[in-house]
């Protein structure tokens, strides 16, 4: 039978919640993304908590909180310990995203769900892969190959292909078919007939306007506000879609010579741009080629200033400016505070470039019509002074003493246990009873052997050892001296990273610039003070879709082109999910599933695949033809079962010669161009390809329909002339002949 495949949504099904799914392939359990909302509610992770200890591998697709926000918490509290796989940009920018979120939370609350050390620990052993790199899993996952492919949504964004026994499971969420300023379009269209496609219905009900028109509307909206004396706030993510917006602003500001300042404000903004400059090979072809020829880096931003605090903004006062500030949800971070400052002025604009997460302030402001007033909580962290500082220091001193005492007791217990177990073997004063009972040959007045048992010489476990303990380390020696261990001289992976990429170590210090690191490492005793207030929303509010996802029309087209055997729909509103499910169900050859959260569906392939061993003698007589990455050949055989193993038996009789088989998929449009290059006059007429004066090619059969598996025929009509044989020969050259 086919490879066993089960899918269980843990979050992000029939809703727009964070993405987290369990995929089991022949018993090997993948966690597809590990997202969390900016609200950080641990109760949302209950489905994940039930299965976290059983996960064998984690695959991360994008570097934002909706895809990896819960990873540190899951590894610290839920027992998740599986290896994590991601591309280099998702790894690097994912850490910066969580750093930014942690700092934003700590500045307004006593956030303790995870720490900076937890973030570092979660990403410490991430296996980083390149696009299209096949990675073979070991041990329990033997035979499974995973490979990341371009998603087109953000830098390093991934469509995962998981292959077992020739069957592909494709996980493609938040993909974008469009080529953008810094990204290529998704590679999803290159996949053909995967066994299972897991994709999202997020944009199933939405259709985009033309990108050029959208960019122009975006710039016009900004310029209109700036020329009117107002300022613009763009709530953005830390290191994802903000990169595309930065390039749009940089390009238009440079072309129009605009003087209004643009600020990129996050706790890690300078570090983000520095890293992005080194990821040119992950961007689209035009950026890479431009750098090769002119050494001009697209992210050497001249019109955008990166800042990590609000001091620069406060110097400008009410002067017109554009501020890109995290977080996009407006729950915490610089965007929250700047919104409160700007909301009271009608001349200002808050422009959202992505949908707000459910339950957040951003989503509340995006409803139609928007609220006229909102309640917000303003919090800030201030240093402790006076009696509060003294009480804090006394409490810290008490905690230190308790920890020191506890450590001392633990060390004493370990010493006691060690001495107790070795006392009998190492102390010469302890006399073994087995050696104390010796026969006496000298005789005694009783004329017999006397057994003398000496007891009471074992020192108590609490006593001090009579001498310092000494343990001799034994080493192996050969004719040339002491044998060395080559592993002691190997360069560690993180050290290699440091040599290949400046400042690219895995620790916090190497990930951040000096200013950001100072924010994180600030240990000044402080407290958080909060107060609720009502904000009158007088400023303009607008939403423009710069999320970098394919729209509904494109998603349907991509699914039809890929033509999976089974389709699993996740991450979309109930309306969008049902709409896309009904649309795809019209294809009778496609099985469509839309599971609820914690509902397990079996999408095992209906195909019967068996493993057979072919002898060298048989293979030596086989003529193979290369087809893409594989080789194909025709073999006549009888399959029988012996000793519970499938083996290839020799044929009982000489098989009849088989008819020639042409393998391939011909597109008439491509063949038309091919014939034109050969000097033939070709044109389409009535759905057929007219070649010269007399020859016509028609493509007939069920396989002409997208996703169908029926037979396909190409008919050559015309007299047996010189053109006929020439065109037939050229047609044969487009196929593999068996």
From Swiss-Prot:
Instruction: Read off the PANTHER family from this record.
Output: CLEAVAGE AND POLYADENYLATION SPECIFICITY FACTOR SUBUNIT 2
- Coiled coil as UniProt keyword: no
Q: Which one GO biological process term can you cite for this protein?
A: mRNA 3'-end processing by stem-loop binding and cleavage
Q: Which keywords does UniProt give here?
A: mRNA processing, Nucleus, RNA-binding
Q: Which GO terms describe its molecular function?
A: RNA binding
Q: Which domain of life is it from?
A: Eukaryota
Q: Where in the cell is it found?
A: Nucleus
Q: Which GO terms describe its cellular component?
A: cytoplasm; mRNA cleavage and polyadenylation specificity factor complex
Record keyword RNA-binding present? yes
Task: Tell me the function of this protein.
Answer: CPSF plays a key role in pre-mRNA 3'-end formation, recognizing the AAUAAA signal sequence and interacting with poly(A)polymerase and other factors to bring about cleavage and poly(A) addition.
Its quaternary structure? CPSF is a heterotetramer composed of four distinct subunits 160, 100, 70 and 30 kDa.
Q: Which InterPro entries match?
A: Beta_Casp, CPSF2, Cpsf2_C, CPSF2_MBL, Metallo-B-lactamas, RibonucZ/Hydroxyglut_hydro, RMMBL
Spell out the protein name for this chain: Cleavage and polyadenylation specificity factor subunit 2
Q: What is the lineage of its organism?
A: Eukaryota, Viridiplantae, Streptophyta, Embryophyta, Tracheophyta
The UniProt similarity line reads:
Belongs to the metallo-beta-lactamase superfamily. RNA-metabolizing metallo-beta-lactamase-like family. CPSF2/YSH1 subfamily.
Q: Kindly give the SMART domains that the UniProt entry links to this protein.
A: Beta-Casp (SM01027), Lactamase_B (SM00849)
């Amino acid at each position: 039978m086919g490879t066993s495949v089960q899918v269980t949504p843990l979050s992000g099904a029939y809703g727009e919640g964070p993405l987290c799914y369990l995929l089991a392939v022949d018993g090997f359990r993948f966690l597809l993304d590990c997202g969390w909302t900016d609200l950080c509610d641990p109760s949302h992770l209950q489905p994940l908590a039930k299965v976290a200890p059983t996960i064998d591998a984690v695959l991360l697709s994008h570097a934002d909180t909706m895809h990896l926000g819960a990873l540190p918490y899951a590894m610290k509290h839920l027992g998740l310990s599986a290896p994590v796989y991601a591309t280099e940009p998702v790894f690097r920018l994912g850490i910066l995203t969580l750093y930014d979120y942690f700092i934003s939370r700590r500045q307004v609350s006593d956030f303790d769900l995870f720490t900076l050390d937890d973030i570092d620990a979660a990403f410490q052993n991430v296996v980083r892969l390149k696009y299209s790199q096949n990675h073979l899993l070991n041990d329990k996952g033997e035979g499974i190959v995973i490979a990341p492919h371009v998603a087109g949504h953000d830098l390093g964004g991934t469509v995962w292909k998981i292959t077992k026994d020739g069957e592909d499971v494709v996980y493609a969420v938040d993909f974008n078919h469009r080529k953008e300023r810094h990204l290529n379009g998704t590679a999803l269209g290159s996949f053909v007939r995967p066994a299972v496609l897991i994709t999202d219905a997020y944009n199933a009900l939405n259709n985009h306007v033309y990108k050029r028109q959208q960019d122009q509307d975006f710039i016009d909206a900004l310029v209109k506000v700036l020329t009117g004396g107002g300022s613009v706030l763009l709530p953005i993510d830390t290191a994802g879609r903000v990169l595309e917006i930065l390039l749009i602003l940089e390009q238009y500001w440079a072309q129009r010579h605009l003087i209004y300042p643009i600020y990129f404000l996050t706790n890690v903004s300078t570090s983000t741009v520095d890293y992005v400059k080194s990821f040119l090979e992950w961007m689209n072809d035009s950026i890479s080629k431009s750098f090769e020829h002119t050494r001009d880096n697209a992210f050497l931003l001249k019109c955008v200033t990166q800042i990590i605090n609000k001091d620069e903004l406060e110097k400008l006062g009410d002067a017109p400016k554009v501020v890109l500030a995290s977080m996009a949800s407006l729950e915490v971070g610089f965007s929250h505070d700047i919104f409160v400052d700007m909301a009271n002025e009608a001349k200002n604009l808050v422009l959202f470039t992505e949908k707000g997460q459910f339950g957040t302030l951003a989503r509340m402001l995006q409803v139609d019509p928007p609220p006229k007033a909102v309640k917000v909580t303003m919090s800030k962290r201030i240093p402790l002074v006076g009696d509060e500082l003294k009480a804090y220091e006394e409490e810290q001193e008490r905690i230190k003493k308790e920890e020191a005492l506890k450590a001392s007791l633990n060390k004493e217990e370990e010493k006691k246990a060690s001495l107790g177990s070795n006392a009998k073997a190492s102390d010469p004063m302890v006399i073994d009873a087995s050696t104390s009972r010796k026969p006496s040959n000298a005789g005694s007045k009783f004329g017999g052997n006397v057994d003398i048992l000496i007891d009471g010489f074992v020192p108590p476990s609490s006593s001090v050892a009579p001498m310092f303990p000494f343990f001799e380390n034994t080493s192996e020696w050969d004719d040339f001296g002491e044998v060395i261990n080559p592993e002691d001289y190997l360069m560690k992976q993180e050290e290699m990273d440091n040599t290949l990429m400046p400042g690219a170590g895995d620790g916090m210090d190497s990930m951040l610039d000096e200013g950001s690191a100072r924010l994180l490492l600030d240990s000044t005793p402080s407290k958080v003070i909060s107060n609720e207030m009502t904000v009158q929303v007088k400023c303009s509010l607008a939403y423009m879709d710069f999320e970098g996802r394919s729209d509904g029309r494109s998603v349907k087209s991509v699914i039809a082109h890929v033509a999976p055997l089974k389709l699993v729909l996740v991450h979309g509103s109930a309306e969008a999910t049902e709409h896309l499910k009904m649309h795809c169900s019209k294809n009778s050859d496609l099985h469509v599933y839309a599971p609820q959260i914690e509902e397990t569906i079996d999408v095992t392939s209906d195909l019967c695949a068996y493993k057979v061993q072919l002898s060298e003698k048989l293979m030596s007589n086989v003529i193979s033809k290369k087809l893409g990455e594989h080789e194909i050949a025709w073999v006549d055989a009888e399959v029988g079962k012996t000793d519970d193993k499938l083996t290839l038996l020799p044929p009982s009789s000489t098989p009849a010669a088989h008819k020639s088989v042409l393998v391939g998929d011909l597109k008439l449009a491509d063949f038309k161009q091919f014939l034109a290059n050969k000097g033939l006059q070709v044109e389409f007429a009535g759905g057929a390809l007219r070649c010269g004066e007399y020859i016509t090619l028609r493509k007939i059969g069920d396989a002409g329909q997208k996703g169908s598996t029926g037979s396909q025929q190409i008919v050559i009509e015309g007299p047996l002339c010189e053109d006929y044989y020439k065109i037939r020969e050229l047609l044969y050259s487009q196929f593999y002949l068996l």
